[in-house]
């Protein structure tokens, strides 16, 4: 075993640096590439600049809009309900005395042959990951 030269910095000793340079890839091989990659990528420890979060308003204790404490006056509620009932009567008279019925498939919002969630997975291309310099 070669003796360690005290004049040389520890990171400049032979074999201290990895043979390949560090990359931005986060695959398993690259996460265990060297101690620096392990702490940054695998453990997620970074001693760089901290990200700034959203600042809350200083003058406001809560960030919500104030809720109206007063309900609608009774007179306006009565007028609204009368207007709605008049509209219903007018709709019945224009349709020949009977209220119109809607198709059951339209009213339920269902369509045949489609999935209920509508979610599709993004398609991965055969070019690999996001264009990093990692070649395994």
Curated annotation (Swiss-Prot):
Comp. bias intervals (Basic residues): 48-57
Region entry Cysteine-rich, spans: 22-37
Function noted in UniProt: Transcriptional activator that increases RNA Pol II processivity, thereby increasing the level of full-length viral transcripts. Recognizes a hairpin structure at the 5'-LTR of the nascent viral mRNAs referred to as the transactivation responsive RNA element (TAR) and recruits the cyclin T1-CDK9 complex (P-TEFb complex) that will in turn hyperphosphorylate the RNA polymerase II to allow efficient elongation. The CDK9 component of P-TEFb and other Tat-activated kinases hyperphosphorylate the C-terminus of RNA Pol II that becomes stabilized and much more processive. Extracellular circulating Tat can be endocytosed by surrounding uninfected cells via the binding to several surface receptors. Endosomal low pH allows Tat to cross the endosome membrane to enter the cytosol and eventually further translocate into the nucleus, thereby inducing severe cell dysfunctions ranging from cell activation to cell death. Through.
Disordered: annotated segments: 48-136
Organism, as annotated: Simian immunodeficiency virus (isolate TAN1) (SIV-cpz)
Cellular localisation: Host nucleus, Host nucleolus
Keyword Transcription in record: yes
Family: Belongs to the lentiviruses Tat family.
Protein name: Protein Tat
Keyword vocabulary terms for this entry: Activator, Host nucleus, Host-virus interaction, RNA-binding, Transcription, Transcription regulation
Subunit structure: Interacts with host CCNT1. Associates with the P-TEFb complex composed at least of Tat, P-TEFb (CDK9 and CCNT1), TAR RNA, RNA Pol II. Interacts with CCNT2; the resulting complex is unable to bind to TAR RNA.
Nuclear localization signal, and RNA-binding (TAR), short sequence motif: residues: 49-55
Low complexity: bias regions: 104-120
